[in-house]
Amino acid sequence: MIELLVVIAIIALLMAILMPALSKVKDQARQIACIANLRQWNFVFNNYINDNDGKFYSGCNDLGYYWPWQLDRAEQDWKINKTWFCPTAKTPVWNEQGVQKESLYITDAWGIEKPSTTGAPASMTYQGRTYTLNRNGLNGSYGLNGYILSIPKTGSFEGGLPSTEGYRDMYNVPNASEVPVFLDALRFDFWPQADQAPAMNEYEFWQNGAQYNMARVCINRHRGFTSSSFLDWSVRRVGLKELWKLKWHRNFDVNGPWTKAGGVQPSNWPEWLRRFKDY
């Protein structure tokens, strides 16, 4: 009997030692799969750019909204195209019957966007072309850097920045390896600015308002990192605080108030972010 208790105690001790390591390995596997998804999206985006003289999608209005409507319908369809989902975030905030979850978290997908759930338009006509949403709608857990959308030259992005701040010619982008394209996010597009703060709550789903754009992308799905593709078509891990060092738009201040160079202090960060690397 004593020997059995000793064996049980040893097994319990080994499990206590091994479980954190196994959890870390599982998380690493999820991020590898996440990065693989973004590589697949690189092919989609690069093919579109090559077919459109270096221009990215325009979106379906002058602000660049609704760009996924311009994808091929099979690329739109989350039931066909599984690369819409980070492995850590697959459950949509709206189900197919149009019922919203009671509690929303960063591990939720942002869908399902379609007429019967969120009231998303079934089709949109812009600049003489009509774009149609697939019957299953949109659903995913990645989002696009809105400053790479080809809005009109005289237009402005969400938040008020003029179109000249964006990247209109994808063949001539300075420091393309620092310009994010597609990454873990709480919406399918966003327009971060250097002075925007992260969310106060680690697991908080994003709120409405242009001031929350950086909070839509600074989300802890990968142990202090996120996954991002870039305009040189590389894909890599990005530290959460490193997001403020990326060149989101042409004049984005990479030494802004949320960087070490800009004077940020540990106490300025929400408590959940303080343990992660500074940049």
What are these regions (language model features)?
Residues 32-279:
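Short, well-structured segments within or immediately adjacent to enzyme catalytic domains
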Residues 1-26:
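N-terminal single-pass transmembrane signal-anchor helix
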